[in-house]
Regions:
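N-terminal maturation segment of proteins
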Residues: 9-607
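Short, Lys/Arg-rich N-terminal segment immediately upstream of the first membrane anchor
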Residues: 1-6, 419
Length: 607
């Protein structure tokens, strides 16, 4: 285990222990200095969330495990308590700055203030979206938490699982009440979203109780616990099945009935403006996700310009490679490219292994070049693995999970290999660079390497920063690293990936600010990206239930590129891209305006 990470993990455990035991009066009541105050708020926030404490994996099955049999209530009272906590924390932050702070402390204060202000701003809306969707909500999050996160390393851990299973039944009742209240206040999801939710709810209750994942996952994990006998394991499984049948499945059936009623009451309008305060909710979502003051109109216009620029570059490559005719729609020319020999790996075990080997070769080439372009090359290894087969139906084409805080797990790029045709050879280089190095893997590993700052700085997640960096990395791999030299089709893959994010700017704002329909959004995305219709349908339905989130990627990339151009103009021949990357990465995630201030400060201080 990395020594610094080991110390960080020990520090987190110690902070939580202090909070649980009340061992430090000064920690709770009069923290000395900003960093101690931020750590106090971070720990208090963790203590409010049993799921977060379990996810950290620090205290479960220890003497300080007070949380391992609990779940956070899904009630308005719990929401109000969380809002009150955040408002009090924000008031307290003003006692520590920003006056008199310099360097990292001033940056820490600004990041913390932005995060707290954003949460308070979102809390203005009691009904700011849809509580249950195909991607989010307790019916998505809690089954995954119970089966994948809750630890079962002892008989006690299994008993606590049963307690949480009972609590899940209570939360389903709370969800039923809250979705019904939302409906009564005019908050109804579009009909196509209700159908997706119904599909998932019905699939959840379809299995026989004895074969249900909430029972079988317990059985599977108990097999690895030597201290639990076969008799004890059988009894624990029996109890889990009983709770499932008596508490959980009835809750799901109530939600099914409620959503069947919703389906008769709703319509197909896609945008968030369909609900009360929808325009204000969308403006707040854009501010939160992009971390800027850009309006929906600004973002829509930006997207249209980027789509036209990228389309022209893609057409030039297709023309040069003799793929299709200029008069053909882009989607048809992309389909013709995919039919070329060698572009699709065989959909066999051997073909899947060959695809992973190809991705590994791309990663190794990037890592050989990285020291010439980065002062700090993260030491954390990266693994390339397939999405588990049982998850691949509902999983995206690929995604990245960062290294463990304690260094026990490497960064991992998961690629969905259900159908190798989903990822043609010409798209793989940009995909690997975005999710791996120097994209998300460098950015996530850099955050773990920051020293002398509160834990919040290592844990902070800003979509515009993280996704903006990954898109910047795709372009930098071409302009700085030369990774697409002699590979025009690989460069086409990079442009298609960027086009996908640019089209999102148009579609997200079209849906939520311009009255676009689901079908209009799907047609626009297919026309301009050439991606498969089924994949685009899933994407558009994601934008419908997560307003604003999809705009952060391209906004972030363009902001970082603009910061670089500004620094190059100021410094001229003194500009060093390695130093620029160090400034952007080695302070961790932050809002884009703060990142720009950081870059300008670096330029001003540059010799």
């Amino acid at each position: 285990m990395n020594t610094r990470l080991k110390k960080t993990l020990a520090a987190v455990a110690a902070l939580v222990a202090i909070g649980l035991t009340g061992a430090s009066f000064w920690f709770w009541f009069t923290p000395v200095g900003l960093n101690n105050y931020i750590n106090k708020i971070t720990v208090q926030s963790l203590l409010r969330s049993p799921e977060s404490l379990t996810s950290l994996g620090l205290l479960d099955d220890t003497l300080l495990d007070f949380h391992g049999d609990k779940l956070t209530p899904f009630t308005r009272e719990e929401e109000l308590a969380s809002i009150a906590f955040m408002r009090k924390a924000r008031e307290g932050l003003n006692r520590y700055g920003p006056q008199g702070l310099e360097g990292q402390e001033r940056l820490t204060w600004a990041i913390a203030a932005w995060m707290m202000d954003d949460q308070i701003a979102q809390a203005r809306f009691e009904r700011g979206g849809y509580r249950l969707t195909q991607l989010d909500g307790v019916t998505v999050q809690l089954p995954q938490f119970l089966t994948d996160v809750h630890p079962i390393r002892s008989h006690r851990g299994a008993q606590r699982y049963l307690k949480r299973l009972e609590a899940f039944g209570d939360i389903l009742q709370q969800a039923h009440q809250r979705v019904g209240e939302d409906r009564d206040h005019g908050v109804l999801p579009p009909d196509f979203i209700v159908r997706r939710v119904l599909e998932q709810l019905r699939a959840f209750v379809a299995a026989e109780p004895a074969q249900h994942v909430l029972v079988t996952s317990l059985q599977d994990r108990l097999k690895a616990v030597d201290s639990v006998s076969a008799t004890q394991a059988a009894e624990l499984s029996r109890q889990a099945q009983a709770i499932l049948e008596q508490r959980v499945l009835p809750g799901y059936r109530q939600l099914i009935a409620l959503h069947e009623a919703l389906l008769k009451q709703t319509d197909s309008r896609a945008g968030i403006e369909r609900i009360p305060q929808g325009r204000e909710i969308y403006a707040a979502a854009l501010a939160s996700h992009t971390t800027t003051g850009l309006s929906a109109e600004d973002i829509h216009s930006l997207g249209l310009r980027e789509v036209e620029r990228l389309k022209a570059e893609m057409v030039d490559i297709l023309d040069a490679q003799g793929i299709g005719r200029r008069s053909q729609p882009l989607a048809q020319r992309i389909a013709e490219l995919n039919r070329q020999p060698g572009q699709i790996f065989p959909n066999t075990d051997a073909g899947r292994a060959a695809m992973i080997a190809h991705l590994q070769a791309i990663h190794e080439r990037v890592m050989r070049a990285a020291p010439r372009h980065f002062k700090t090359v993260p030491p954390h290894p990266l693994e390339i693995v397939r999405v588990p087969e049982y998850q691949q139906d509902g999983s995206p084409g690929g995604y990245y999970n960062g290294p463990a805080l304690d260094g026990s797990r490497p960064g991992r790029f998961y690629i969905n290999l259900k159908d190798t045709a989903d990822n043609p050879r010409w798209t793989l280089a940009s995909f690997m660079i975005h999710e791996g190095a120097p994209g998300h893997h460098f950015q996530a590993a850099a955050a773990l390497s920051i020293t002398g700052v509160p834990l919040m700085r290592q844990m902070a997640n800003f979509t515009a920063y993280a996704e903006g960096w990954a898109l910047y990395a795709e372009r930098m791999a071409k302009t700085d690293m030369g990774l697409y030299e002699g590979d025009p089709l690989g460069d086409l893959g990079r442009l298609q990936a960027e086009m996908f994010r640019a089209a999102r700017l148009v579609v997200d704002t079209g849906l939520h600010a311009k009255g676009w329909s689901r079908e209009q959004a799907i047609q626009y995305m297919i026309e301009h990206t050439g991606m498969p219709a089924a994949e685009i349908e899933r994407e558009v339905e994601r934008y419908v239930v997560s307003p604003g989130q999809a705009t952060a990627y391209k906004v972030g990339q363009l902001a970082i590129l603009d910061m670089r151009r500004e620094a190059e103009a100021e410094l001229g021949t003194r500009f060093d891209a390695r130093e620029f990357h160090e400034v952007v990465l080695m302070n961790g995630g932050m809002p884009l305006d703060l990142l720009r201030d950081n870059v300008r400060r670096w330029v001003k201080q540059h010799p």
